[in-house]
Design a protein with these regions (language model features):
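S-adenosyl-L-methionine
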Residues: 24-70, 80
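Cationic, low-complexity basic patches in intrinsically disordered or flexible, solvent-exposed regions
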Residues: 12
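Class I SAM-dependent methyltransferase "Motif I" SAM/SAH-binding loop
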Residues: 75-76
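Acidic, Ala/Val/Gly-enriched low-complexity intrinsically disordered segments
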Residues: 2-9, 22-23
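Class I S-adenosyl-L-methionine-dependent methyltransferase module
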Residues: 88-191
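Conserved SAM-binding loop of SAM-dependent methyltransferases across substrates and taxa
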Residues: 80-90
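Structural motif
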Residues: 70-72, 96
Length: 191
């Protein structure tokens, strides 16, 4: 399982706390995107990462000259196109994202609004997982986290931490639910 957040990201977030504005998280996100190569932080089936050139070719020829552009992403998934557009076009002042998966949207909102509370939750679940020595114990932890995640009564921080964990440790980063709406992907070989 990869580290939940790059140390540089956390340091950057800590530095931007000195900005006295209600929009500091937006400012830190924009400056972070401009200073780093932001990439999707979750795996997602059907990602647009390999289609970026074809999709970008569909933009109006003068798009980079538009003032205060708004980017709308109706099927954000892992966010490859979103991150590319925000880095490539500094004239995009607003981004609106959507997806049918409410837990995915909760994940994006939690990263945007509560990253400082999310980081310790991710570190805790990662430490528990790495402390396990054998594959059987790791598989048991995966199943316990999956069961708790499926209870659907979690606060956004816990929900997102479990969502991340399952995404990183399940089979191929797949998100699939059964007829009851319960996440049912087995553990993967990332263990």
């Amino acid at each position: 399982m990869a580290a939940p957040l790059d140390v540089n990201v956390r340091q950057h977030i800590n530095k931007t706390k000195g900005i006295h504005t209600d929009d500091w998280k937006i400012i830190s996100l924009n400056s972070l995107i401009m200073k780093t190569k932001a990439k999707p932080f979750i795996k997602w089936v059907g990602g647009k990462g390999q289609l970026i050139e074809q999709l970008e070719a569909k933009l109006p020829a003068d798009f980079d000259n538009w003032d205060d552009a708004t980017y709308i992403e109706p099927f954000v998934g892992g966010g490859a196109m979103l991150f590319y557009m925000l880095q490539r076009y500094p004239n995009i002042k607003y981004a609106v994202i959507n997806d049918i998966n409410s837990d995915l949207i909760t994940c994006y909102k939690t990263v945007r609004d509560n990253v400082e509370e999310l980081i310790p939750a991710l570190q805790d679940i990662q430490a528990q997982y790495y402390a396990l020595q054998d594959m059987g114990a790791k598989r048991e932890m995966f199943m316990a986290v999956r069961q708790r995640y499926n209870e659907k009564n979690l606060d956004p921080i816990e929900n997102t931490a479990k969502f991340f964990f399952l995404n990183r440790t399940c089979f191929n980063g797949l998100y699939r639910v059964n007829k009851k709406g319960l996440f049912n992907v087995p553990c993967g070989k990332f263990m």
